[in-house]
Amino acid sequence: LLRQTNNGVNRLASKGNIILAVPNTWLQLSVIDILSTLKEQYICVKNLQEMYQKIRDYPGSILLIDILSFERSYWDIIECLKKEDPDLSLVCLISKDKLAYVHSLEEDDACYLVEKEKADQMLLPALTRAREDQQKRLPTLNKKEVITLEKDYKGFSNGISTNLSRRSFLKASAVTAVASGVIASNPLATGMKALAVGESPVAGNEEKLVSSVCRSNCFQCCRLYAHVRDGKITKTTPAAYPDEIYTGCCLRGLSLVQRTYSPTRIKYPMRRIGERGADKWERISWDEAINEISKKFMAIQSQYGPQALVVDTGSGNYGLVHGIQGVVTRLANSIGCTRLNICYDQATGYGADRVIGGGIWLWGNEPRTMLDSKTIIVWGSNPINAQPQNWRIIKEAKNKGVKVITIDPIYSATANKSDEYIPIVPGSDTMLALAMMNYMIEHDLLNVDFMKRRSTAPFLVRKDNGKILRKSDFLPGIDAAGDDFYVWDSIANKPVLLKEGPEDVAIEGSFLVNNVEVDTTFTLLKKHVQQYTLEEASKLTSIPVEKIEYLARTYVDGPTTIYTNYGINHYLNGHLWSFAAFIMASLTGNIGVKGAGFAGLYVLHMPVNFAAVYVTNRKMANNTLPQAIFHEVVKDQKWGEKPYPIKAIFTMNSNSMSNFAQQNVWFDDILPNIDFKVVVDTEFTDNARYADIVLPAAFWFEVNDLRVSYNNPYMLYQEKVIEPLYESKPDAEIIALIGRKMGLGQFFPESMVDTEWIKVLLDSDGFRRMNVTYDRIVAEKVIRVQGSAEKPFIRGEHFFNTPSGRAQLYCENPLPRVNFGQDLTGIIEKERLPYFRPPAEAWKDSPLFAKYPLVFLQELSRFRTHSQWYNTPMLRELDPEPLAKMSREDAKARGIKTGDIVEVFNDRGRAVVKAEVNDSISTGILSIPKGWQREQFIDGCFQELTNTEVDPMSVNFAYFDCLVDVRKV
């Protein structure tokens, strides 16, 4: 219990309630000095064994621990501590430069982080809040004890508001502690200024801060300060956005210095001298490299045709000049080459586009809108790992009373921090959405007003051809702009055109219009989803009937936001889930309104002048060859029945060999048939190791660039921090060198450096109307270009990007995302409404299930974004090697223990790694977190296991639609 000493400082009444586990003698004495000044009692322990014993002896204690000073990993220590005493409160001492290592501990409500350098300011507040947590766990106290506790606590608070977040409490009480003289006499006080998260750091006399931005494809776009001393970057810290809620940085952003100065960075142009993949290279000059590359590119195109050169870009850099959307497109168009059509993470947006339009990227709200939700359903996503700044917003919403529910096959970190976790059978998400929709319709849980005003529910569909009835059906020759949709006026009891403004419209019924039989789109939808009962859904998803019913009613009781990304789209049926989910939102009015809709991917649609950068007077690149059939075309040297020789690959901002499905097709089909392969990168990735020439790219801090953000409403300027290291060059400069050597100097004048390209990109009427100019972005570094903190952007608030401006409940003309000659027989008609189709392979009824009974997943790690950061020392220390994570039941059945070397295998390939028995993994699932490179496996690679089969409509790699088994080596 809390008690109060004569000087007003709180202390614990019972001896031993503070256990001190600090092995370093100097640090231990310093902490003891603080505790003595505060008249705190404590017990010192010498090692982990003694610490565990004292925790057993004194349950409900506060453990003050230097958690990174022990040989065991901090997560192992935490797990053991929780088993010994679930009510234990932790106060962890962490050096400021190691805070990134233990970022996840901040999410633990019973754990407080204290910077060693500020222990004199932060320790007392941390201990006080830890005690407050303990009191919440105590049995009910009698009235007298409660009054005593309240009096004691008020005696300390001295005006500090207790209605604060944990972070705010520590900040505020540290200031008060200094002001009240509690620690003024402490010899450890150094006079350092405490820096609040989100405030601009203070640079030292010899240090300067340069505004930067992380440009990876986690879609977070964290704004950073690069700290520069003596011409070198010393660290990165979060830089404030004007709207504080978007300020933050994760482990990856904090470790960017190590990526910049990586000892394994590609430093010079290199030419292969051994077999591909042998990792034997010779250094060559830039002149030699550019001459050889341009000469071979021109020779190959001259002999085999312009399509024989493939320009391959991925998502490794979202800068508008040097990244995947930048000057590389100008080169591709100038030489009329083949540009691979991306086949990863396309299905979610493809399904959403059928309902709300706008293409495959424009479907999410500004993340701030989640603060206005009543419920947030995190469906098939793990933002704590994948998008930590979005998680901060979800957590803030949760702290304000918003309910957070996670639906996921894996008990993820996000599931752990949610109010409710609903496990689901992998690949059955569409079935769940359809059953929820059926239940809502059956029980009249719909927003009929929204359906009438803002959806196509009242539109009439012809029974003879499945098309929506329009004015042009009876008046041929009307152009699209003058066409209109028929609805049924329920008051006048007749068909009318929508623009005539019917008094009321029928959303259900079958009618006859000029001898044409029609149904409303909602009638078709209602009849269609009746087959998806709760009982059938429960059987296929493993979710109890009453839980599905509860989930449906909770969703309807909005406003509700569904937070999702690309987990579900990694199955062949992925687009059908988003198709169903967006229709479900449209039936219930949970879209286009405050606090409702979808979050996870918010993309700005900005008036960037890409055309001026992309377009030349040359032949445009062919962008219709999907990555999924690339290996077939290269192997056969034909596309369908037509010759289509491909002999060279030029790759930038992509690690194709690591991230394309079924890696073995590179060794079997692609590399043997390619004459020349060039890779531009910063590290020797899988892709670079199998190149003929590699060129060293400048890193993000070594160029000027522009980023239009994902998942926040800002445009950011990347100011060059340092000059390119070694002999690296900016991507745009490399492209220009090749272009000029290929005789395209008119498209790549030497005057066009990156700052000039930025000026071109900003030269648009749209930006002029917004007062966004080059001079302004350079001066301000960050500009909000959509919405405001008071009125954040809501997708579809005023209209949807569809022909009618309404949410479409029926897709009359389903088209494949990209048409590459695939067989669509019998598919188009089925795709007009969402339906459940089991995963092609990862399903219990699959012919392969008896042989390979484990669904293979690739979790997104907090330590990597896809394959980026795969070799960063700080993060490798925390996550040193790939692991095969499996359930206790599956491991026991195979005689496997944590640490055993195992082979994960199927008919396509194998991966040899260490096993980890992990209770977050459900029975029947095996997961290897993604992003590891081939060289980091004992043998094989996780990407050997996946397959290149794609859905003919979404044309998207289905990484999770995969079965494997595992055995001990």
Predicted regions located by residue number:
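Two-component/phosphorelay signaling modules centered on CheY-like receiver
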Residues: 24-43
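N-terminal leader/propeptide and maturation segments of large enzyme subunits in energy/redox metabolism
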Residues: 272-288, 445-545, 721-812, 878-880, ...
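Alpha4 helix (beta4-alpha4-beta5 surface) of REC/receiver domains from two-component response regulators
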Residues: 76, 94-113
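Conserved phosphotransfer microenvironments
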Residues: 61-81, 95-98
